[in-house]
Each structure stands twice: as C-alpha cells, then as structure tokens.
C-alpha cells in the first residue's frame, strides 16, 4: 500500500511539472516582440502626447478583454499630473485560488526626457521606451493569451502602471502610478507579485534586485529555481543593487513582490536610443516562460 501511495504521489508531481512546462512553452517571444513594435509605433507614451497614451491604453485593453474576467481603468491624480492604471483580473475557479492570488505588473509609460544622452541637444527629447516601458507590457500581454488558453490555478491580476518614469523631473518621484494604486486599493492584498521592467535586451542580465531579495526572498528563490531548471541564463546568481521601481509600494505594505529588471542599466537607458532594434524575442521568451511556470507551478 505504501509503495502505491509513493508511486501515485510521484505521478501527480510529475504531471504537475509537465503541465507547467507545457503551458510555459506556449509563450511566443515573436508575439511579444510585435507588442513592443506596436507600442513604439504609437510614439512616446508621455503626458504631452495624449494621443499615444490613448492608443496604448486602447491597445492593451483590446488584447486583454477577450481573455480577462474583467478589465478596469483606474484614473488618478498626483499633484498636477493625471494618470491611468489598467487592471486586468483572471479569476480562477480552482479551490483556494484566491489564497494564492498573484500580481504581475509593468509600467506602460515612457520617460519624457533623455537626460543620459551624450548629445546635450537631445536631452530634452522623450525616449521611445522599447525596453524601458514596452517590454514588460509585451510580456504581460502574451501571458494573458496563455492564461486564456490554459486557466491558471490561481487568481491573477495583471496591472499596468502609469507615471513610473517621472522620477527626478521637477522634484517628482519614480513609481507614481504604483504608489497611487496601493494607496487607492487598500483592500488589495495578493500573496505575492512580480514586476517586469526592461526585459528585452539582446544581452539581458537580471541579477537579484536587493529590495526584493531582502523582503521577498522566498518568492525570489522560487523564481530563480525555475530559471535554473529552464536554463534561463539571463537570471544571474549575483546580487544587483537597490532599485526604486513599482515593487516598492507593495513591499512597504508587506506584500512580497520581486522586481525582474536588467542591471546594470544598458547604455541606451534614458536616451533616444531605447528603440526596437535593442530588443530580442529570445530574451522576452526566456522571461515569459519563467513567469508562466511560476504561475502554473
């Protein structure tokens, strides 16, 4: 009897692992890359370009509504700025699904200046944000397609944050949209989450961001274990640094959220050279498969 129980347990665990791999393998890096291209073609997603912001919001909703249980636009104000966070929920009908509710997030705005440009004449120009802005969104939109095809075992929230990249401009801070989201949704307390930021570089390197490591270590260990199994070499065993990003507002209220972000920042970061040619479908696919496996694991 004991032998049969062990055998049955082994089979169940094997099936679970196989399902996780099967679903994550459906992530298509080329589809994700196309999402980056389409966002970039709208132009900089900044307050002074409202048409590009409207087009991007409409685009994201268009690719979420057929799949998500519900989508919600949450407008917010901060000082004299107006922003919109987009929230898509995939409700799972699995038993105890809400006890393991997971948040996946990315910012969808872009930097309105390019202060890292070597050419001083270009520093006042906005960045297109192919990597820093569009790449995280692209991964989430492709994941949404997979979640619709294969209902996940947990309830998922995909949240697209506005006004992340206004930091150090006129005294503003980074991660405004996520701060406002946490402030305005005090009832929302998922068991954990992942932020995706700058995840398409052709030479992608994701070390262990230190706020995440210090305050969400168990979740980070799970992610890196999956990455090791998948031979996702972009996930480095080395420590990065402390980065101000959309995970911090969640960490401050006790929600363990891991920031997956390229570091050191690439040389085109916050310049006009953050363009589509810097992006790799292979990098997008590697990150997307790891996150998908985390969901189905």
Say what each PLM segment does:
Residues 124-218, 222, 234, 242, ...:
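Acidic/histidine-rich catalytic neighborhood of metal-dependent amide-processing enzymes
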Residues 23, 34-96:
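A non-catalytic alpha/beta surface segment that caps or lines the substrate-entry region
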Residues 10-18:
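Hydrophobic h-region of N-terminal signal peptides that target proteins for export
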Residues 45-47, 77-79, 94, 108-112, ...:
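Solvent-exposed loop/turn segments at secondary-structure junctions
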């Amino acid at each position: 009897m004991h032998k049969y129980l062990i055998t049955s347990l082994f089979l169940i665990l094997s099936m679970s692992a196989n399902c996780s791999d099967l679903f994550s393998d459906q992530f298509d890096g080329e589809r994700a890359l196309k999402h980056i291209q389409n966002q970039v073609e709208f132009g900089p997603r900044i307050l002074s370009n409202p048409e590009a912001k409207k087009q991007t919001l409409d685009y994201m909703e268009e690719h979420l509504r057929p799949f998500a249980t519900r989508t919600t636009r949450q407008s917010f104000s901060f000082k004299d700025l107006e922003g919109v966070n987009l929230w898509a929920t995939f409700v799972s009908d699995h038993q105890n699904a809400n006890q393991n509710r997971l948040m996946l997030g990315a910012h969808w705005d872009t930097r309105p200046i390019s202060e890292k440009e070597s050419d001083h004449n270009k520093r006042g120009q906005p960045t297109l944000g192919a990597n820093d802005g569009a790449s995280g969104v692209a991964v989430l939109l492709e994941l949404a397609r997979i979640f619709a095809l294969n209902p996940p075992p947990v309830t998922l929230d995909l949240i697209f944050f506005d006004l992340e990249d206004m930091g150090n401009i006129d005294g503003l801070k980074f991660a405004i949209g996520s701060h406002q989201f946490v402030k305005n949704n005090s009832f929302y307390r998922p068991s954990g989450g992942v932020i995706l930021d700058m995840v398409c570089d052709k030479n992608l390197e994701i070390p262990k961001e230190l706020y995440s490591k210090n305050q969400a270590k168990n979740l980070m260990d799970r992610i890196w274990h999956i990455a090791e199994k998948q031979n996702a070499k972009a996930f480095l065993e080395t420590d990065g640094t402390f980065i101000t990003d959309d995970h911090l507002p969640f960490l401050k209220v006790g929600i363990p959220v891991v920031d997956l972000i390229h570091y050191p920042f690439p040389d085109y970061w916050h310049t006009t050279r953050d363009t589509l040619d810097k992006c790799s479908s292979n990098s997008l696919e590697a990150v997307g498969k790891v996150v998908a496996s985390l969901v189905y694991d």
